[in-house]
């Protein structure tokens, strides 16, 4: 029994491992370029079967805990390996030994508590390494990165356990584009640990406390170009004179991101910034100012000099006691050299006139996403305010009047670029006043319904996209770029009103087509973006867009954004791929051709009818059909005559003087029906013929040259033939009065030809001795 249980357990383990391996393989997908993706696939290990074809492997967000020496052994061409957010706690020493081509390695947010330099020694091509978020306390016992001579981006540290930076940690690294250190809980920093790196383009430093900030600053000031401080509480920061006497600082940009600061500590920070002689740009993102703007300091503290700072950026600044905030007048003197200021989404509603006047060098001012209205803007743009200002951005504020906004800015003599997008203007007056040097105006997303002469004619660039415009008819002689996407325009603007236009972006409007003539009318146009419209793919439009090879150079969004909206059977297809049928593209020519063909057919039919007596046949058929449609007076036939005699009027003498005498004077006499004698006067002749034939037992045809020339004889012959067909009897008797060659019989007498081929006929003898026999045979035929 125990043996059986043991076998069952072994089989269960084998099956479980088999299923796990199968699941691992199913969770990994690779394309033909060797890019393999297996993120978030619940993998418990690195899939087996990986070969040298794999160039990129993403196994992030799985449950991998262990990497063995054999897992990646065959991946000799692997260039990128992403193992972030797994549960990796162990990596064998030679796990990466075959990855000499690896350039990107991400081991962040795992459970690696000890780092080994043996992992990284084979990675001679590595340019990116991320070790963030692992619970190690230090960066190993020996230098981890000394062999990574090509490393450009390095990210190390964690929020909780990384407490110590040692001098050996970054030994061997001479140049880095980016170095990110999460030293949120840093407690020990060995002097000159970061000084070994000769040049770092961008250093990102996470520090909760500022205790070791000055020491680190001393080491990096001569090697870092951009220093970024994150998640730091500087409320109690105090600057102390540095013992180094550094004068060759390389720092050009200092960024504070998610930093807490007070009125007093801000002054201390500015003292620190005074040590950076080459500082050009200062940035505060998502910071909190726990103060009221009381920056008044003692005489001993007046050592602040903004130096060469040209750019100041403040985004999403939070001031809890905003309602108590001061007027910043103590800082006015520090702003005279600043050229670029951005204060975005920080609840700014006013720039005091005095501050505006102190900003003498300011060329660029961005006050986007604030609370500015026309009345306060007028105070900000007072006389002598912003004398050098060229670009003013007031995007997404509370401006409501274009006329007032333009008048307010008249004091800014050098202003050339104005962005007042995402304000709610709704309407536009007929005329406005603007600074006379205006070149650029952005009115996108302002809910305007029309454009008027309020737009300055000096503009070179105009953006009115994402509004409710259905017409653009402004004369802007100097305009070079027009952005008018996401409106309701149904056609391109008039080119004669925009003679200098180089760029036109008019996508996502209501345009259905445009022609070569329209585009050619824009003589200077270099770039057109017209995708996203509902194009009617007519033959003319398709021919123009598909045959003009140079069009692709002008249409920057061609062909992906040019889709047909109609005809319905090509809706959604790219314009360049649509092909219409000949009938759709040449309808006029096709109809004309069909009309010509129909005319020729009618003409040919007429000629054939004339040549082969078609009209005569039609008349005869019509008469027959009319006669057949008439109701019969009695269900049974009333035979009144022994024979109806069909003959030509020119053969009347033979019929009346010979035939009638022989048959009607015979005993018993035969009763014959002759048209001259027995037709009812006033009755339609066709009806007389039909009635006489139907009331006669037989029909006698007196054939001669005269007979075949008679139209009425032809009728009588045809009606007799129809009767023969309808009643299936032998009612026709042919008398050949004179010899007739069948070739001489006209084609329209096809019935006569057929009867002569199938029936025996009586021939009138020229010898009088034989005539008695002729009459005997005729009488016998009539009686039969």
Curated annotation (Swiss-Prot):
The gene is TLR2. Ubiquitinated at Lys-754 by PPP1R11, leading to its degradation. Deubiquitinated by USP2. Glycosylation of Asn-442 is critical for secretion of the N-terminal ectodomain of TLR2. It comes from Pan paniscus. Cooperates with LY96 to mediate the innate immune response to bacterial lipoproteins and other microbial cell wall components. Cooperates with TLR1 or TLR6 to mediate the innate immune response to bacterial lipoproteins or lipopeptides. Acts via MYD88 and TRAF6, leading to NF-kappa-B activation, cytokine secretion and the inflammatory response. May also promote apoptosis in response to lipoproteins. A motif (ATG16L1-binding motif) lies at residues 761-778. The chain crosses the membrane at residues 588-608. Residues 609-784 are cytoplasmic. It comes from the Eukaryota. It is found in: Membrane; Cytoplasmic vesicle, Phagosome membrane; Membrane raft. This is Toll-like receptor 2.
């Amino acid at each position: 029994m125990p043996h059986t249980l043991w076998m069952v357990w072994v089989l269960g383990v084998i099956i479980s491992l088999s299923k796990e391996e199968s699941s691992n393989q199913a969770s990994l997908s690779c394309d033909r370029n060797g890019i393999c993706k297996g993120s978030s696939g619940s993998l418990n290990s690195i899939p087996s079967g990986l070969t040298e074809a794999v160039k990129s492997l993403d196994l992030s967000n799985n449950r991998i805990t262990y990497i063995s020496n054999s897992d990646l052994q065959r991946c000799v061409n692997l260039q990128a390996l992403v193992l972030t957010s797994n549960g990796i706690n162990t990596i064998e020493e030679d796990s990466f030994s075959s990855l000499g081509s690896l350039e990107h390695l991400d081991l962040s947010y795992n459970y690696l508590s000890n780092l080994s330099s043996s992992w990284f020694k084979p990675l001679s091509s590595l340019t990116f390494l991320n070790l963030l978020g692992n619970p190690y306390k230090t960066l190993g016992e020996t230098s981890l990165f000394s062999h990574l001579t090509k490393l450009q981006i390095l990210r190390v540290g964690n929020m909780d356990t990384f407490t110590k930076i040692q001098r050996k940690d970054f030994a061997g690294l001479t140049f880095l584009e980016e170095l990110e250190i999460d030293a949120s809980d840093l407690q020990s920093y060995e002097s000159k640990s970061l000084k070994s790196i000769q040049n770092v383009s961008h250093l990102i430093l996470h520090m909760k406390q500022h205790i070791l900030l000055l020491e680190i600053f001393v080491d990096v000031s001569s090697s870092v170009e951009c220093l970024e401080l994150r998640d730091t509480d500087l409320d109690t920061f105090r600057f102390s004179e540095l013992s180094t006497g550094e004068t060759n600082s390389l720092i050009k940009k200092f960024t504070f991101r998610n930093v807490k600061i007070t009125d007093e500590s801000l002054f201390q920070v500015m003292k620190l910034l005074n040590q950076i002689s080459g500082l050009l740009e200062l940035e505060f993102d998502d910071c909190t100012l726990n103060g009221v703007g009381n920056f008044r300091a003692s005489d001993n503290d007046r050592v602040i000099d903004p130096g060469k700072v040209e750019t100041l950026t403040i985004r999403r600044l939070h001031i809890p006691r905003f309602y108590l905030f001061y007027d910043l007048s103590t800082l006015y003197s520090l702003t005279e050299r600043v050229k670029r200021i951005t204060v975005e989404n920080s609840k700014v509603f006013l720039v005091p006139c005095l501050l505006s006047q102190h900003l003498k060098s300011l060329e660029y001012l961005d006050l986007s996403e604030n609370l500015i209205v026309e009345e306060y803007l007028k105070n900000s743009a007072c006389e002598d305010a912003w004398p050098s200002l060229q670009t003013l951005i007031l995007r997404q504020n509370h401006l409501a009047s274009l006329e007032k906004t333009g008048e307010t800015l008249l004091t800014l003599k050098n202003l050339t670029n104005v962005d007042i997008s995402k304000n709610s203007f709704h309407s536009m007056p007929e005329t406005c006043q603007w600074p006379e040097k205006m070149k650029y105006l952005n009115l996108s997303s302002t809910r305007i319904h029309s454009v008027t002469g309020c737009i300055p004619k000096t503009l070179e660039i105009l953006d009115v996209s994402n509004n409710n415009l259905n017409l653009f008819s402004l004369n802007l002689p100097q305009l070079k770029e027009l952005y008018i996407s996401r409106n309701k325009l149904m056609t391109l603007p008039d080119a004669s009103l925009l003679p200098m236009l180089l760029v036109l972006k008019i996508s996502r409007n209501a345009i259905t087509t445009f022609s070569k003539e329209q585009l050619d009318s824009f003589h200077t146009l270099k770039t057109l973006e017209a995708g996203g419209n509902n194009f009617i793919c007519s033959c003319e439009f398709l021919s123009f867009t598909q045959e003009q090879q140079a069009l692709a150079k002008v249409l920057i969004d061609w062909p992906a954004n040019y889709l047909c909206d109609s005809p319905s059977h090509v809706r959604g297809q790219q314009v360049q791929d649509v092909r219409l049928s000949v009938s759709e593209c040449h309808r006029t020519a096709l109809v004309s051709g069909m009309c010509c063909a129909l005319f020729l057919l009618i003409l040919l039919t007429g000629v054939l009818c004339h040549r082969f007596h078609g009209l005569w046949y039609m008349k005869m058929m019509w008469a027959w059909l009319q006669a057949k449609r008439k109701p019969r007076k009695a269900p049974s036939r009333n035979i009144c005559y022994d024979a109806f005699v069909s003959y030509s009027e020119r053969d009347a003498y033979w019929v009346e003087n010979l035939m009638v005498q022989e048959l009607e004077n015979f005993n018993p006499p035969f009763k014959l029906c002759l048209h001259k004698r027995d037709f009812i006067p006033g009755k339609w002749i066709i009806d007389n013929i039909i009635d006489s034939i139907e009331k006669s037992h037989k029909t006698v045809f007196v054939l001669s040259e005269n007979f075949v020339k008679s139209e009425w004889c032809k009728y009588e012959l045809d009606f007799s033939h129809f009767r023969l067909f309808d009643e299936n009897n032998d009612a026709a008797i042919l008398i050949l009065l004179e010899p007739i060659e069948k070739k001489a019989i006209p084609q329209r007498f096809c019935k006569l030809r057929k009867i002569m081929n199938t029936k025996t006929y009586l021939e009138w003898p020229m010898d009088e001795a034989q005539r008695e026999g002729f009459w005997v045979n005729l009488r016998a035929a009539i009686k039969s």
